[in-house]
Curated annotation (Swiss-Prot):
GO biological process, any: regulation of postsynapse assembly
Name by which UniProt lists this protein: Solute carrier family 12 member 5
Biased composition (Polar residues): 46-55
InterPro entries, sorted: AA-permease/SLC12A_dom (IPR004841), KCL_cotranspt (IPR000076), SLC12_C (IPR018491), SLC12A_fam (IPR004842)
GO MF term set: ammonium channel activity; metal ion binding; potassium:chloride symporter activity
Glycosylated position list: 314, 333, 351, 362
Residues recorded with modification Phosphoserine: 1044, 1047-1048
Binding site for chloride: 184, 414-415, 569
Record key words, sorted: Cell membrane, Cell projection, Chloride, Disulfide bond, Glycoprotein, Ion transport, Membrane, Metal-binding, Phosphoprotein, Potassium, Potassium transport, Symport, Transmembrane, Transmembrane helix, Transport
Binding site for K(+): 113, 410, 446
Length: 1138
């Protein structure tokens, strides 16, 4: 026999019209206020959050209370995903020290000026700045000389090696730069955040010194062009003879260099905006000069320029002192001597005493620029290294030599070599011409999409400049005479710039263009170096440099600029471009070496945060680039390399040992213990940065009577998460006393260790003996780990048989575990249906890992699938992310924002936004809630007397009715129709359950009398009706699940409370509604998924609802094979920053 109740409810529109809208409004805290520990390390608080930099703190603070009621108690700490994603639209990433950012920081009291979003693309933001920084003074002043000395073959190898070094470095830099957002600091930021403050500080200071000496080199190049090619008469110091020209030139360089440095520093101090305004002008000069060179090469093939050079025998003559390349000239019928005669003879008379070599050899005039079609390339293939003071000679020309040991008069108008040259020296001089590849990363804050622009723009710029350099080497050797190439200052071609003689339409194009380009490069160096020093100083890793972190009110680094100018003056006092170039080569090579090292280390360690969007990198390429940089350092100058490494080492040790303690043990074991102690003490200094966060797992397993693990799949899953490279502690609890159960604990440890070894889980095992299970688990959670090496995540299985346990202690222990992990700010992973999880030998050839991101609680849901997909079991599973849109959410914009967020996180996944519109609470939800509350009352009655049970039932009834009136005054009215056959058999069926059948067309019972509050007949005709049916089948099924300790008398007292829907706690109804609706959506989308991850709601704050909480979770995960409930620890575990 069944007992039927008919319940009629008003339409939803009627109830919604009179409902108080505030009753369903709940505030969501700003996602930036997520509770988390203070983060130390880099002084940038933005990096602790995933990406949020929104100024709209109110948007998205409301949520649909009925659809998401299951998560309502956590909305103050875990915001809805829609409100989190809305921050993407207002995300800005400003470089440190930028003018607008500093003004905004300094004017907090007033109205802040809105900052424009980054607008620069790949071409303007990365490609052109890199071209400007790479092309420089060496191309115009020294490349022709390098080709003449080393020959085409060796010069080609030199350029290829240097360009390969920068290309490999650019690949490594692209991987680092795309591993998150680089707010400011360029290479210093990337290295320091990848290798730590010690390496970052050491290499950052080396890079600063390199940039500063680069400024000195550019200034010296500017003075050389000014005094040698533009205005030679401006020289203050003049040589009395040829031997004193070098010393006079050095003094002129020092004086004019100091003046130019002062002017440039003043311009930078007054306002960097003027430097930026003229940057494109300087870049235009560089590009125009290079185009003029190529135009000249093309023209020389059919119309070579007229630049004759004069040879005495095979010796090259300087054209400064004479005009006619001949010993004698004919004026009418008379033979007269030329000015050249007077330079080699005692007088202009024909019978004068002349130099012996001048007397024995003839004077020959040849073209200095024969052109590309002359076949000159064969003669310039091989090297012609010179020693200092040697005359530049042309191979293949007849020459009558002198006796060995005959001194050469330095006052004769020969072209002399000013320095001893060799291959390694040329490498050191040439290498600065390929530096400047960091220009794109230094401007990352101004780019529209830095993760796309930096790799593309930098690599394209290096490819372009490499092509220009390599082609220039070949074209210079094919078009220009060898003795002209080896003439560093163009003395043989009337003092013209050698590369200018090849240019079209005029050499002045190259001279003026190179002058302005070197001026611009010097200004850029004096602008960038102080900001780099300011970034290092503000990090606070080098205490004595902190004073240089301050500046003017607008953020300009005044003190850093002053120090930069002083160091730059040191380079100018050296006064030789060829001496300064190897110095800055050392510092740049060291910086590039550590960029490659950082990429190689990150790749080999495979830390969870290492997810570069740039995919075309490999640790072997980074290692090759690092080796090449180290080799070039010693090739250029082994003593400069040692000095640079010593400086970096001293800075490293200073930063490392500033307040640190060092201790050495005895032997290998003592060293290991000392290193472990040292590392643990350093970990104790503070919580890890978000970028260094990794899951440190505490895996709670249960052992049977034979001390074997009940669910070994938990350890299989732990092994599959090993990509996190974190700590693993496998813990278990034995009930009893330590004295009696110590042997069993040892056997359990051995059993767990064997299983860990079989599952390839590297970690520790800990078995605790406690008087009860709850205290033992609590002890493991509190005391697991050592010092800073502690767990931050707890992995546990779902209590599968929590309903059937006689003492019902399992689910109570589970809820206490959830509460303790929350209190300890630990993440919690709960595996449901753990027996269905795959073992390590299994492989999924297809399928998906579905993430249901309901609320944001630190990003754990994003990180876990990424780690799992590194394991071969899950490698072929794709990742899908679902999030839920509410009534007021723009689902299209949410999908776009979520896609952008994943792009910044460097995570590849399919994105889908599921719309959950407001809907009526279904009859099935009421049924589930009613059954749940009945079970709850049964559980509570186990320890109550009859009078206590009656009072408890009455208090719950009153509380439920009061809740209905307070929270939902327009709740749909309920009408109860009881048939005549009311003979019930409650005592005989103590565990009867209620089944609801939703029927839109069934008529109400005519024999029932209307209730006092019944609506008129007209309204009742359209009301939906719901039938409650008490069925025996469910009663039998429920009874067969397990024995119940409840007495029949207690059940009779319990059923004295009528199971009316109006008695239901409306909070439970709404929570059940959330669980049912979410479950329907999840099952619909993810029924065939290999694994489903979703947010785990927190336990109720009122402990009276603990048993209901278990039912909510059970309903939420019904009909799903493999489920992992994830609950964050209250801090960010994933970030978009590098």
């Amino acid at each position: 026999m069944s007992r039927r109740f008919t319940v009629t409810s008003l339409p939803p529109a009627a109830s919604a019209a009179s409902a108080d809208p505030e009753s369903r409004r709940h505030s969501v805290a700003d996602p930036r206020r997520l509770p988390r520990e203070d983060v130390k390390g880099d002084g940038n608080p933005k990096e602790s959050s995933p990406f949020i930099n929104s100024t709209d703190t109110e948007k998205g603070r409301e949520y649909d209370g009925r659809n998401m009621a299951l998560f309502e108690e956590e909305m103050d700490t875990s915001p809805m995903v829609s409100s989190l994603l809305s921050g993407l639209a207002n995300y800005t990433n400003l470089p440190q020290g930028s003018r607008e950012h500093e003004e905004a920081e300094n004017n907090e009291g007033g109205k802040k000026k809105p900052v424009q979003a980054p607008r620069m693309g790949t071409f303007m933001g990365v490609y052109l700045p890199c071209l400007q920084n790479i092309f420089g003074v060496i191309l115009f002043l020294r490349l022709t000389w390098v080709v003449g000395i080393a020959g085409i073959m060796e010069s080609f190898c030199m350029v290829f090696i240097c360009c390969s070094c920068t290309m490999l470095t650019a690949i490594s830099m692209s991987a680092i730069a795309t591993n998150g957002v680089v707010p400011a600091g360029g290479s210093y930021y990337m290295i320091s955040r990848s290798l730590g403050p010690e390496f970052g500080g050491a290499v950052g200071l080396c890079f600063y010194l390199g940039t500063t000496f680069a400024g000195a080199m550019y200034i010296l190049g500017t003075i050389e062009i000014l005094l040698a090619y533009l205005f030679p008469a401006m020289a203050i110091f003049k040589a009395e003879d040829a031997s004193g020209e070098a010393a006079a030139m050095l003094n002129n360089m020092r004086v004019y260099g100091t003046c130019v440095l002062t002017c440039m520093a003043t311009v930078v101090f007054v306002g960097v905006k003027y430097v930026n305004k003229f940057a494109l002008v300087f870049l235009g000069c560089v590009i125009l000069s290079i185009l003029a060179i190529y135009a000249g090469v093309i023209k020389s093939a059919f119309d070579p320029p007229n630049f004759p050079i004069c040879l005495l025998g095979n010796r090259t003559l300087s054209r400064h002192g004479f005009d006619v390349c001949a010993k004698l000239a004919w004026e009418g019928n008379e033979t007269v001597t030329t000015r050249l005669w007077g330079l080699f003879c005692s007088s202009r008379l024909l019978n004068a005493t002349c130099d012996e070599y001048f007397t024995r050899n003839n004077v020959t005039e040849i073209q200095g620029i024969p052109g590309a079609a002359s076949g000159l390339i064969k003669e310039n293939l091989w090297s012609s290294y010179l020693t200092k003071g040697v005359i530049v000679e042309r191979r293949g020309m007849p020459s009558v030599g002198l006796a060995d040991g005959t001194p050469v008069d330095m006052d004769h108008p020969y072209v002399f070599s000013d320095m001893t040259s060799y291959f390694t020296l040329l490498v050191g001089i040439y290498f600065p011409s390929v530096t400047g590849i960091m220009a794109g990363s230094n401007r990352s804050g101004d780019l529209r999409d830095a993760q796309k622009s930096i790799p593309t723009g930098t690599i394209l710029a290096i490819a372009t400049t490499s092509a220009v350099y390599i082609s220039s080497v070949v074209l210079f050797g094919a078009c220009i005479e060898g003795v002209v190439l080896r003439d560093k200052f163009g003395e043989a071609v009337n003092g013209n710039l050698v590369v200018g003689t090849l240019a079209w339409p005029s050499p002045w194009v190259i001279v003026i263009g190179s002058f302005f380009s070197t001026c611009g490069a010097g200004l850029q160096s004096l602008t960038g170096a102080p900001r780099l020093l300011q970034a290092i100083s503000r990090d606070g890793i080098v205490p004595f440099l902190q004073v240089f972190g301050h500046g003017k009110a607008n953020g300009e680094p005044t003190w850093a600029l002053l120090l930069t100018a002083c160091i730059c003056e040191i380079g100018i006092l050296i006064a030789s471009l060829d001496e300064v170039a190897p110095i800055l080569s050392m510092f740049f090579l060291m910086c590039y070496m550590f960029v490659n090292l950082a990429c190689a280390v990150q790749t080999l360690l495979r830390t969870p945060n290492w997810r570069p969007r740039f995919r075309y990198y490999h640790w072997t390429l980074s290692f090759l680039g690092m080796s090449l940089c180290l080799a070039l350092m010693f090739i250029c100058s082994w003593y400069y390399a040692l000095v640079a490494m010593l400086i970096a080492g001293l800075i490293y040790k200073y930063i490392e040992y500033r307040g640190a303690e060092k201790e050495w043990g005895d032997g290998i074991r003592g060293l290991s213990l000392s290193a472990a102690r040292y590392a643990l003490l350093r970990l104790e200094e503070g919580p890890p940065h978000t970028k260094n966060w990794r899951p440190q797992l505490l895996v709670l397993v249960r052992v049977d009577q034979d001390q074997n693990v009940v669910h070994p799949q938990l350890l299989s899953l732990t092994s599959q998460l090993k990509a996190g490279k974190g700590l693993t502690i496998v813990g278990s609890v034995l009930e009893g006393t330590f004295l009696d159960n110590h042997p069993q604990a040892q056997r359990a440890e051995e059993s767990i260790r064997r299983l860990m070894e079989a599952e390839k889980v590297k970690g520790f095992c800990q078995v605790v003996i406690s008087s009860n299970l709850r205290d033992g688990v609590s002890h493991l959670i509190q005391s697991g780990g050592l010092g800073g090496l502690q767990h931050n995540t707890v992995l546990v299985g779902w209590p599968r048989n929590w309903r059937q346990k006689e003492d019902h202690q399992t689910w109570r222990n589970f809820i206490e575990l959830v509460r303790e992990t929350t209190a300890g700010h630990l993440a919690l992973l709960v595996t449901k249906n753990v027996s269905m999880f795959p073992g390590n030998p299994e492989r999924f050839s297809e399928g998906s890992i579905d993430v249901w991101w309901i609320v944001h609680d630190g990003g754990m849901l994003m990180l876990l699938p990424f780690l799992l997909r590194h394991h071969k079991v899950w490698r072929k599973c794709k990742m899908r992310i679902f999030t839920v849109a509410q009534m007021d959410d723009n689902s299209i914009q949410m999908k776009k924002d979520l896609t952008t967020f994943l792009y910044h996180l460097r995570i590849t996944a399919e994105v889908e936004v599921v719309e959950m519109h407001e809907s009526d609470i279904s009859a099935y939800t009421y049924e589930k809630t009613l059954v749940m509350e009945q079970r709850s009352q049964i559980l509570k009655q186990m320890h109550l007397t009859k009078n206590e049970r009656e009072r408890e039932i009455q208090s719950i009834t009153d509380e439920s009715r009061g809740s209905i009136r307070r929270k939902n005054p327009a709740n749909p009215r309920l009408r109860l129709n009881v048939p005549e056959e009311t003979a019930c058999d409650n005592e005989e069926k103590p565990e009867e359950e209620v089944q609801l059948i939703h029927d839109q067309s069934a008529p109400s019972c005519p024999s029932s009398s209307p209730s006092p509050g019944e609506e008129p007949e007209g309204e009742r005709e359209t009301d939906p009706e719901v039938h409650l049916t008490w069925t025996k089948d469910k009663s039998v099924a429920e009874k067969n699940k397990g024995p119940s300790p409840v007495s029949s008398e207690g059940i009779k007292d319990f059923f004295s409370m009528k199971p009316e829907w109006e008695n239901l706690n409306q909070s439970n109804v709404r929570r059940m509604h959330t669980a049912v609706r979410l479950n329907e959506v999840i099952v619909n989308k993810s029924r065939d998924a290999k694994l489903v991850l979703l947010n785990m709601p927190g336990p109720p704050r009122n402990r009276n609802g603990d048993e209901n909480y278990m039912e909510f979770l059970e309903v939420l995960t019904e009909q799903l094979d493999r489920v992992m409930l994830v609950r964050g620890g209250g801090r960010e575990v994933i970030t978009i920053y590098s």
